[in-house]
Amino acid sequence: MYIESKDYKIEIKFLKNWKSDSGTYSVSKSWMEYQKDFDWLFEEIASGKKSKRAFVIGWFNCVDSISKIMQLGKGRGCRPKVNEERVAYFPFLKRVDSQTYAADLEYYYDVAYQKQSLNLIGRDNTGRDCIFLGNSDDVFHFAIYY
């Protein structure tokens, strides 16, 4: 979305998955599709447009794990271990133990509606923030990156 008169640019993505005939779930897009959007936002922030750029992700809260709709694991298979570089983009997720599998990630609702700074591995994280909008009873969740 682009509001030319204000020079606002907002990238919006809707997360969804699909269930195959065999009963397994698959995410709708590869991680690289989202990585491109994060990279675009961070380049815009670095060029001084923090207050004019955002990346919004929305999804229905209808699956037992966000990993059913977003590739947060490393490797293939039905229970991949968490990819630390990817999970760093989601400060509103928590691990249940140190050897966490992507399917075991849970929402950390205590930080919902609060600004969270991103702590990305190997990157300058200055000015990279996120707000998670949702609670366990909500039908739809949002993550706004700015």
Features from the language model and the residues they span:
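Residue-identity detector for threonine
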Residues: 13, 24-26, 100, 126
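Non-catalytic C-terminal interaction segments of nucleic acid-processing enzymes
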Residues: 68-146
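Mg2+/Mn2+-dependent nuclease catalytic core
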Residues: 17-40, 44
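Glutamate identity and glutamate-enriched acidic tracts
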Residues: 4, 11, 33, 43-44, ...
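Phenylalanine-focused residue identity feature
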Residues: 14, 38, 42, 55, ...
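Conserved catalytic cores of phosphodiester-cleaving nucleases, focusing on short active-site segments
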Residues: 1-22, 41
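Nucleic-acid nuclease catalytic cores
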Residues: 44-74
